[in-house]
């Protein structure tokens, strides 16, 4: 059974976990803020299943996962760098759907070129909106133009947050 590792299991990570469980993967996660996550799958006929997941260590997620997906807030340092790539399973894949600058892209290229990492999918990258040419042209890296927040729900939350910030500044309410 393939193992699907999540780094970050908040609201978005839990939605991604549903996909992994739904396709029959063994889902593990590491989250600095959540020790457990309850993943509920609702089916078209009204049935539902619930899965309780316990947080694993960061190193376990790296070393045991066939696929790693990242869903964490912005950071001022790399979360995936030389040492983390060394710990990852041979031939694994990595997806960054959180923030640019989370993965050291030079190390990512080295690890893809060596075969240690088989593929990457990146929605956010360093130097947005222009990825490095090595990232852009690598046949084992799929890029999307930071569209992860392009859902209706995300746009609604952004609108409310902006309105709250404007209100705080202008003191209307």
Predicted features, each with a name:
Residues 1-15:
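Glycine-rich NAD(P)-binding loop of Rossmann-like domains
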Residues 3, 22-26:
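Residues at the starts of beta-strands that form the adenosine-phosphate
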Residues 17, 21, 112-113:
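Gly/Ala-rich phosphate-binding loop of Rossmann-like dinucleotide-binding domains
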Residues 31:
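Conserved acidic E/D residue at the C-terminus of a beta-strand in Rossmann-like folds
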Residues 34-133:
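Rossmann-like adenosine-cofactor binding region
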Residues 48, 119, 124-173:
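C-terminal helix-to-coil terminal segments
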């Amino acid at each position: 059974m393939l193992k699907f590792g999540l780094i970050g299991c908040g609201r978005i990570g839990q939605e991604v976990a549903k996909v992994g469980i739904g396709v029959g993967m063994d889902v593990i996660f590491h989250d600095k803020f959540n020790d457990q996550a309850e993943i509920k799958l609702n089916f078209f006929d009204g049935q539902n299943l619930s899965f309780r997941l316990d947080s694993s260590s960061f190193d376990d997620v790296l070393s045991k996962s066939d696929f790693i997906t990242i869903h964490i807030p912005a950071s001022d340092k790399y979360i995936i760098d030389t040492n983390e790539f060394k710990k990852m399973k041979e031939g694994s894949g990595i997806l960054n759907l959180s923030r640019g600058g989370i993965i050291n892209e030079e190390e990512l290229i080295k690890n893809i070129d060596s075969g240690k990492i088989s593929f990457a999918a990146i929605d956010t990258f360093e130097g947005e909106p222009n990825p490095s040419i090595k990232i852009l042209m690598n046949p084992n890296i799929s890029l999307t133009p930071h569209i992860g927040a392009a859902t209706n729900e995300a746009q609604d939350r952004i609108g409310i947050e902006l309105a709250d910030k404007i209100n705080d500044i202008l003191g209307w309410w």
